[in-house]
Design a protein with these regions (language model features):
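N-terminal, positively charged/glycine-rich alpha-helical extensions of SAM-dependent methyltransferases
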Residues: 8, 24-78, 325, 332, ...
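Conserved class I S-adenosyl-L-methionine
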Residues: 54-105, 119-123, 143-146, 206-231
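Class I SAM-dependent methyltransferase SAM/SAH-binding core
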Residues: 109-167
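A short acidic, Gly/Pro-enriched loop at the edge of an enzyme's catalytic core
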Residues: 166-177
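A short glycine-rich, Lys/Arg-flanked "PGG" loop and its adjoining helix->strand segment in the class I
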Residues: 191-206
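Short alpha-helix
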Residues: 230-248, 261
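Short, basic amphipathic alpha-helical segments that act as recognition/interaction helices
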Residues: 306, 314-340
Length: 340
């Protein structure tokens, strides 16, 4: 860890700034110590990597995932080529296409969540210059250390930390792009993880995520059943229900043999906005807004027929007739006059 990392890292719970308490320092690098939040929460630094994992007692699924990846660093890198070989894909070409979706420039600030051993990280790093910024985080110390070794010597300033994807230790609206491929389905709370990615992204930033999921039209094929026999994660659904309301320009496609999904989107601000006050022509009339907010209690069928005849005789829309009649009746009963 470098002291400059304090400009980026924050408490994953409150986003307050952190104070460094140095244990061991070597050539300007912090080897051990503590990061302390304004609220007094302490996060250790071990072997040069800050551990900002929250909560300290992870949900069972996340704990199991961490233990799994901590135990298979060697096998992961040695065998990952099988995923691409099975589907006749070139790993380097595929990863570069994924990173293309981030629309980076050399000065971009980029976060990779669940960066693993750095196979995508080095592609991202190759797109960034010394005025850019790359932050890599993972829940597994073993995987993150391997990624750190892979990226030794890259030009872009790089920050490494351990964290839970549900509580990212970065400030609001900081990054130009966020990337996570191959881990989303293993997060215990996908909705919260995606919301956190949005929180740390600037308005307009690009987010790219993906993982295993055989599409519905292939689920009953022999092709799918062969894959699922070895890896049940292919049964996972695409997390469309978990997508944040801030997602704009959403693109979903299937990649790597058509059995992994890739979602990319821009970050918007809050819910989408629309002009709901445009007068709608026709018998019903009104606007989208009045049709939603202006609903009244039901009337009897006989009264409804009278209203329809009266509206037709006056030759106005139903909205105009109801607005006028109800307004006049309300003012009369209240003993008030129409304001000019």
């Amino acid at each position: 860890m470098n002291k400059k990392d304090l400009e980026i890292l924050v408490c994953p719970v409150t986003q307050s700034r952190l104070v460094l308490k140095v244990g061991e320092e070597l050539n300007g690098e912090i080897i051990s110590g503590l990061l302390v939040s304004e609220e007094g929460r302490e996060y250790p630094i071990n072997n040069g990597i800050p551990d900002l994992t929250y909560p300290s007692q992870l949900p069972e699924k996340d704990e199991n995932v961490r233990a799994f990846y901590d135990s298979r660093g060697d096998a992961y890198d040695a065998n990952l080529h099988l995923t691409f070989d099975t589907h006749g894909e070139d790993e380097n070409e595929v990863r570069n296409k994924f990173v293309d979706s981030l629309e980076l420039n050399p000065s971009s600030r980029v976060l990779e969540v669940a960066s693993g051993t750095g196979r995508d990280s080095e592609v991202i790093a190759s797109r960034l210059g010394d005025d850019g910024q790359l932050c890599l985080t993972d829940i597994s110390p073993e995987m993150l250390i391997r990624g750190q070794k892979r990226l030794a010597g890259v030009a872009v300033p790089t920050t490494y930390c351990l964290s839970n994807a549900s509580y990212l230790p970065f400030p609001d609206q900081y990054f130009d792009a966020v990337y996570s491929f191959g881990a989303l389905g293993e997060f215990s709370d996908i909705t919260r993880c995606l919301a956190e990615m949005v929180r740390v992204s600037k308005i307009g930033a690009k987010i790219v995520v993906g993982d295993e999921s055989i599409p519905p039209w292939l689920r009953e094929t022999e092709f799918a059943k062969i894959l699922i026999t070895t890896n049940k994660q292919f049964l996972a659904k695409v997390p469309l229900d978990e997508m944040p309301v801030e997602a704009r320009n959403v693109c979903l496609r299937w990649v790597i043999g058509g059995v992994f999904y890739l979602i990319d989107f821009n970050v918007g601000e809050g819910e989408p906005k629309g002009n709901f006050d445009i007068e709608i022509p026709g018998v019903r009339g009104g606007t989208l807004r009045t049709r939603y907010f202006g609903l009244l209690e039901s009337v009897t069928p006989e009264t409804k027929r009278l209203i329809e005849r009266a509206r037709e005789k006056k030759d106005v829309s139903m909205y105009q007739w109801l607005e006028e009649v109800n307004r006049q009746a309300a003012l009369r009963d209240l003993g008030e006059e129409e304001k000019p």
